[in-house]
Amino acid sequence: MKILVPIDGSENSLRALRHVVSHHGGSGEAIELHLLNVQAPIASGAVKMFITQTQLNDYYRDEGLAALKEARAIMDGSGLPFHYHIGVGEIAPTIASYAKEKGCQQIAMGTHGRGGLAHAFLGSVATRVIHLTDLPVSLIK
């Protein structure tokens, strides 16, 4: 079973990952986890006057790796097979399309991420993912 766990570096996203690992680790079930960090694109055209696309890609990679650092450590200690990826784009659609592209059978995610007031109620990203995918979505509080 392939499970996608979106990781933004927040405690809620790490809690979702720990839940999946504890639930599936040692179960004997063939499982493959996909960790996905999505970086919001820097939309301002003015920014591109001062930095190159390569510098921007390096920034996305560095920020993504920083957000995935603890999740990768959890996975390294779990013994479960995993892949990680850093995407750039609108967060919820990127999560939904990545899950489809990789053939995931489930998405497990925290109810709230690093967002601010927009996430005060059931996280707006989680809500959008639910509406954008036909896959089962497990929300971990």
Predicted regions and their residues:
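General small-molecule cofactor/ligand-binding pocket signal
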Residues: 34-36, 83-87, 138
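Class I S-adenosyl-L-methionine
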Residues: 21, 65, 69-76
